[in-house]
């Protein structure tokens, strides 16, 4: 039975039992920003189990795409060395949300395994939690499993309920016993039943885990029965397929065998048992589906985990002798295997291929040099009888050549060595500390404050009349007063000033009373809810307890708000035009522009930029109101609000509905989309691998930009004696004229070179049967120099020639040597001899080479030395 059929039978079986088939959720969890990847079937139902996400069904079944690489759950280092470890796997599961419980869960599992999949009953063993008499009795008395094949597992982790057969969601919350089903491969395979000293062998393999959410545990560890008891089960498709296909390794099942054959094809390897092929076959699944779900290779978070997996696969291809890109070619094979079950993979096939190809090409630029350094270092360690690679070297490979630590550790493991990871960590920590020290030091950084939080009025007001000074800082230290001319940070009890956060810059403005004026240049957070006003006291003396009028620069705030609101609309438009994989990676919103970094693997086309602009400007014309609501985080996310991974959100969040956009945002915004006025993208480019940057302007800035652009178009049209509407056609005509003139000029230069060649030939000096010539050809370009050298070689028959030209303070050099003389006089060495004297370098073939220089004053002397240099070699 093939893997695809096993998956289909599982889902159809539970559908026949009243379960709703629910599509696999994304590998990027949408309901838990703390979780790196979806690693089990229950992740998408977490809030359902907690009772905060009502669904129209009480029974569900899924085939969930899952990844275990990076973070707490990390199988990466074992992939390729064991029979059952994977970075990507499919978890088959059935779930009951307060519906059926132990009896039906156990009965369904037994029926599916023994009737649908027709596994021999005598091959199945089960475990239960030691205190779960109910589950034990169901297995023994209702299902009829012999008691000698039912094993009670007690508390084996040092505390009550700390057992392999007792599941918990966390330190508190839903928990309960579980029962696991094992398959016995028979006495020919070493290993003992679960709970025995030999349980780590391969004879008894766990295939299904049934979790019974029976209790709620409070902070004191007390257990109370849940009013609605639930079921969460998980069975790895790959493990089940291995059992049903009568093989002992997951890599021997049909799905993996097809991918392994494909990996062998693209790496040109015939030995299908090579472990590196297993690694590549496993990794193409994880990498492809992560990219499908919007993850892009990068240097942090999920992006870095993806990069590590890609580069590990590339390294194994390199180990097989593959020196060029190959990994991306497997995407089509993966689509053939899994595209029917997961149509999102087929839809994203080209994008996945492009992302992987770009990442491969980038790593192949450094892998060869890095591997040679690593191999030399390992050979040195072996020669000295050592077993540990220096962590500093591992860090150099990471920092300079892009080798993730686990890739280096992988190579060491193959040699029976390890990496000094503490030394690696120390080197990494030093680099981070240096980066922090070199970074911008904010005026509020490190300020000690223990007072009350600042009340923010800036959403509604641009000024606050009775703001009291509660803290003052000069040069990072708390003071009681500030004198005129001093730079300081002022903390108020109330303020309309927005502190820099979420990409939006802090407000500027004035704090003043009758005797005092403090100019605020920037507003920053001292603590999460404490606002620091950084600036200069222009007049008077400022003391703690003084009462001031705090007033922001309203014009600057309005322009900043327009840009911030436009950013929300642009983010949504980018996802509509480019795809749902677009995720914000950084932003800067100020009064002049909005700068937005996002995950995307290719430059935007002109048409895509125009479409984004059109969508945003249509939303502006619609003049929709901005609606702000404060609500629980979970409710906001369930309502479709976009949350950014890595951002820290409290229990209560601020949700902004603006036109067709809905995001979590604490920034300041326009009241209606029409207030933005006009939106224009002015810059699009790349800032890192897989990260694009767009800069856009709004309102009067955008109008001014278009007016200036229009003026330049009119100037260009006037210069070309054309109407603006005819500009493209007129430019094409001028380009044709330029090409024609360049062609004529080239012909004239060639003719000149021919005539000069005849004259130069007469200047050649014969040395040992070889004519030597070193001369300057005024006005010649590189092409003319080459043609002249070729003609001189034909004319002189046996020659060593150097010709030079000077233009704009730069020297161009061409050297040519006829075949009979090139064994003793190499053109590359000859041109380098001259180039080094004129401040340059160069090289090429033995018969023809070129170079450049920046010191034309030295050229006459350099050319004069050619004759002697050649004579020494003949």
From Swiss-Prot:
Compartments reported by the entry: Cytoplasm
GO aspect biological process, one term: alanyl-tRNA aminoacylation
GO cellular component annotations of the record: cytosol
UniProt keyword list: Aminoacyl-tRNA synthetase, ATP-binding, Cytoplasm, Ligase, Metal-binding, Nucleotide-binding, Protein biosynthesis, RNA-binding, tRNA-binding, Zinc
Pfam families: DHHA1, tRNA-synt_2c, tRNA_SAD
Top EC class for this record: ligase
InterPro entries with a match to the protein in the record: aa-tRNA-synth_II/BPL/LPL, Ala-tRNA-lgiase_IIc, Ala-tRNA-ligase_IIc_anticod-bd, Ala-tRNA-synth_IIc_core, Ala-tRNA-synth_IIc_N, Ala-tRNA_ligase, Ala_tRNA_ligase_euk/bac, DHHA1_dom
Cofactor binding mode and count: Binds 1 zinc ion per subunit.
Reaction catalysis annotation: tRNA(Ala) + L-alanine + ATP = L-alanyl-tRNA(Ala) + AMP + diphosphate
Record-listed E.C. numbers: 6.1.1.7
MF terms in GO: alanine-tRNA ligase activity; aminoacyl-tRNA deacylase activity; ATP binding; tRNA binding; zinc ion binding
Residues binding Zn(2+): 564, 568, 665, 669
SMART domains named in the record: tRNA_SAD (SM00863)
Family label: Belongs to the class-II aminoacyl-tRNA synthetase family.
Domain notes: Consists of three domains; the N-terminal catalytic domain, the editing domain and the C-terminal C-Ala domain. The editing domain removes incorrectly charged amino acids, while the C-Ala domain, along with tRNA(Ala), serves as a bridge to cooperatively bring together the editing and aminoacylation centers thus stimulating deacylation of misacylated tRNAs.
Function: Catalyzes the attachment of alanine to tRNA(Ala) in a two-step reaction: alanine is first activated by ATP to form Ala-AMP and then transferred to the acceptor end of tRNA(Ala). Also edits incorrectly charged Ser-tRNA(Ala) and Gly-tRNA(Ala) via its editing domain.
Stated name of the protein: Alanine--tRNA ligase
Source organism per UniProt: Burkholderia ambifaria (strain ATCC BAA-244 / DSM 16087 / CCUG 44356 / LMG 19182 / AMMD)
Gene name tied to this protein: alaS
């Amino acid at each position: 039975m093939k893997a695809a059929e096993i998956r289909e039978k599982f889902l159809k079986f539970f559908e026949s039992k009243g379960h709703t088939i629910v599509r696999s959720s994304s590998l990027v969890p949408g309901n838990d920003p703390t979780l790196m990847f979806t690693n089990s079937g229950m992740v998408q139902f977490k809030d359902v189990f907690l009772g905060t996400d009502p669904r129209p069904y009480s029974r569900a079944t899924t085939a969930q795409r899952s990844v275990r690489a990076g973070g707490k759950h990390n199988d990466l280092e074992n992939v390729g060395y064991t029979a059952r470890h994977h970075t990507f796997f499919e978890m088959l599961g059935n779930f009951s949300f307060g519906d059926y419980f132990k009896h039906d869960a156990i009965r369904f599992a037994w029926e599916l395994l023994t009737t649908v999949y027709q596994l021999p009953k005598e091959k199945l063993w089960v475990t239960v939690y030691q205190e779960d008499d109910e589950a034990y009795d169901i297995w023994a008395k209702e299902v009829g499993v012999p008691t000698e094949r039912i094993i009670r597992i007690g508390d084996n982790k040092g505390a009550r309920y700390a057992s392999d057969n007792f599941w918990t969601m966390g330190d508190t919350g839903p928990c309960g016993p579980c029962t696991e089903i094992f398959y016995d491969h028979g006495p020919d395979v070493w290993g003992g039943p679960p709970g025995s000293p030999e349980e780590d062998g391969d004879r008894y393999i766990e295939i299904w885990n049934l979790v019974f959410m029976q209790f709620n545990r409070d902070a004191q560890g007390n257990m109370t029965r849940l009013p609605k008891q639930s079921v969460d089960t998980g069975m790895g498709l790959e493990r089940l397929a291995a059992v049903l296909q009568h093989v002992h390794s997951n890599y021997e099942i049909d799905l993996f065998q097809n991918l392994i054959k494909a990996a062998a094809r693209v790496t040109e390897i015939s030995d299908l048992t090579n472990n590196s092929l297993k690694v590549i076959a496993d990794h193409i699944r994880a990498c492809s589906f992560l990219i499908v779900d919007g993850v892009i290779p990068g240097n942090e978070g999920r992006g870095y985990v993806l990069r590590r997996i890609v580069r590990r696969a590339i390294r194994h291809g390199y180990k097989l002798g593959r020196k060029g890109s190959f990994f991306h070619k497997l995407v089509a094979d993966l689509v053939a295997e899994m595209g029917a079950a997961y149509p999102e993979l087929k839809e994203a096939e080209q994008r996945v291929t492009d992302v992987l190809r770009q990442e491969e090409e980038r790593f192949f630029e450094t892998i060869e040099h890095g591997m040679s350094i690593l191999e030399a270092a390992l050979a040195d360690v072996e020669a000295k009888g050592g077993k540990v690679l220096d962590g500093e070297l591992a860090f150099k490979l990471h920092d300079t050549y892009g080798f993730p630590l686990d890739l280096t550790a992988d190579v060491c493991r193959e040699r029976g060595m390890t990496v000094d990871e503490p030394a690696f960590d120390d080197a990494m920590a030093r680099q981070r500390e240096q980066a922090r020290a070199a970074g911008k030091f904010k005026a509020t950084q490190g300020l000690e404050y223990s007072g009350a939080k600042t009340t923010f009025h800036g959403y509604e007001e641009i000024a606050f009349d009775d703001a009291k000074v509660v803290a003052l800082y000069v040069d990072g230290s708390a003071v009681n007063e500030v004198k005129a001319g001093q730079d300081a940070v002022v903390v108020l009890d109330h303020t309309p000033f927005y502190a820099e956060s979420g990409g939006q810059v802090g407000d500027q403005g004035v704090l003043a009373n009758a005797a005092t004026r403090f100019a605020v240049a920037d507003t920053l957070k001292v603590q999460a809810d404490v606002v620091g006003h950084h600036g200069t006291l222009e007049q008077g003396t400022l003391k703690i307890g003084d009462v001031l009028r705090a007033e922001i620069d309203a014009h600057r705030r309005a322009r900043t708000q327009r840009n911030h609101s436009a950013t929300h609309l642009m983010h949504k438009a980018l996802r509509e035009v480019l795809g749902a994989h677009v995720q914000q990676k950084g932003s800067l919103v100020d009064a002049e522009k909005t700068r937005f970094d996002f995950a995307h693997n290719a430059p935007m086309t002109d048409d895509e930029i125009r479409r984004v602009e059109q969508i945003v400007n249509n939303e502006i014309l619609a003049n929709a109101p901005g609606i702000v609501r404060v609500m629980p985080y979970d409710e906001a996310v369930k309502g479709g609000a976009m949350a950014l991974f890595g951002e820290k959100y409290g229990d209560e969040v601020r949700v902004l509905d603006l036109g067709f956009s809905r995001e979590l945002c604490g920034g300041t915004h326009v009241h209606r989309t029409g207030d933005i006025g006009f939106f224009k993208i002015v810059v699009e480019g790349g800032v890192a691998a897989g990260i694009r940057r767009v800069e856009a302007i709004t309102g009067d800035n955008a109008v001014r930009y278009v007016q200036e652009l229009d003026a330049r178009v009119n100037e260009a049209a006037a210069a070309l004696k054309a109407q603006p509407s005819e500009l493209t056609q007129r430019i094409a005509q001028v380009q044709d004229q330029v090409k024609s003139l360049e062609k004529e000029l080239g012909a004239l230069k060639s003719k000149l070179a021919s005539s000069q060649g005849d004259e130069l030939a007469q200047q050649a000096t014969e040395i040992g049967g070889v004519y030597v010539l070193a001369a300057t050809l005024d006005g010649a370009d590189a092409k003319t120099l080459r043609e002249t050298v070729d003609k001189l070689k034909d004319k002189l028959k046996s020659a060593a020639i150097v010709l030079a030209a000077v233009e704009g303070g730069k020297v161009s050099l061409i050297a040519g040597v006829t075949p009979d003389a090139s064994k003793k006089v190499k053109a590359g060495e000859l041109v380098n001899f001259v180039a080094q004297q004129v401040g340059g370098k160069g090289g090429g073939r033995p018969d023809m080479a070129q170079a450049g220089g920046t010191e034309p004053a030295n050229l006459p002397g350099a050319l004069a030395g050619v004759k002697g240099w050649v004579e020494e070699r003949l």
